[in-house]
């Protein structure tokens, strides 16, 4: 079996999450490898939930300004397209609120459209390459449609 991508779409409260969880659990109980990612999941492989993007100069200024948390910030960053991605909600809560206020302004969904689309397309290409090499079911709950709407 090749990897199967299953997108669950629907209106809020229509049973998307319940349906996705139920099918995922049935597959797993029957020994069929399956992954489930719901909207808002910080580990979602094809979404940038609470991820900021910084160009190199912005990144180095951020590290200087928050040098007390430098190691933790660097440990969680991902080099990307002449800059860095930072999944900022994955950082420990002892970082000051001013950090989160600053970083959330660089959230991928707050970037200019052309930059936003480039990062999202790169992420989907990476995701599809990884998924194609596997043999499992991957459920994405209501993310694709909203990502596309947010990107327009």
Where are these regions (language model features)?
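P-loop (Walker A) phosphate-binding loop of NTP-binding proteins
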Residues: 11
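ATP-dependent NMP and nucleoside kinases share a basic, alpha-helical "lid"
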Residues: 104-152
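Active-site signature of alpha/beta-hydrolase-fold catalytic machinery across serine-
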Residues: 22
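Phosphate-binding P-loop
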Residues: 1-3
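Conserved substrate/cofactor phosphate-moiety recognition/catalytic segment
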Residues: 25-74
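Hydrophobic anchor at the beta1->P-loop junction of P-loop NTPases
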Residues: 8
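Conserved glycine(s) of the Walker
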Residues: 15
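Hydrophobic positions on the alpha1 helix immediately C-terminal to the Walker A/P-loop
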Residues: 19
